[in-house]
Amino acid sequence: ADILEGIEVKHLIIKNEKFFISTNRGNFEADQVVIATGAYHVPNRHPLSERLPTNILQIDAREYKNANTLPDGPVLVVGSGQSGCQIAEDLFFEKRKVHLSVGSAPRSPRMYRGRDVVDWLDRMGYYSMPIGEHDDPKSVRNKTNHYLTGRDNGREIDLRRRAIEGMNLHGRLEELTINDIQFSNDLSKNLDGADSVYCRIRNSIDEWISKNNIEAPKGEIYTPCWEPTEDVKGTQLECKNLAVVIWCT
């Protein structure tokens, strides 16, 4: 069958077990429809963004290309989902001074006990489980994607490791004036929450392997390598020390 690209679907109904689709290129009928849409392509800046000084460049995650396309100087990345963490790492590895506002996004292993974690979860039936069978269907629908990366042939992201190497981590953005940015004192809580999900995924794989007597390499115990201390709370940042803010919210 031909593939038509750039089609805007305006309306979709089902009638007599048939789907009827209205688009900007006419009407179509189908026996099956796969809905694979989302809002990740729609910018969602924090309302306080309007208060930033005009000399600071503001861009959204979808506008980011690489470090060379940005003005020289420190960068604040707001949001620690997949885009935020990957962009922060990319800039950090290009020797830019990076500040990352860390939210409640969870993280995941990339490889564990000899396989890609997605492979394990698929074998365990996780991706085949209907929404209604989850403990909390509503939260599953709205859950943020776990952060990891395809960089270096695919690997996990440990923000604690980046902090040891020099990335500046802050809590969730709380207040913003023309002079400074205030962050919530929740960095430890957010890092612990991400690690909790990370360890829970590993534990579920361990249980599956044990239950099904599967031969697999032994897993290592995760131990946090860094903790925020009183002198690195990172709850305030002066706007004069920033060149760019990237919104990954």
Where are these regions (language model features)?
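Flavin (primarily FAD) cofactor-binding/catalytic cores of flavoenzymes
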Residues: 1-249
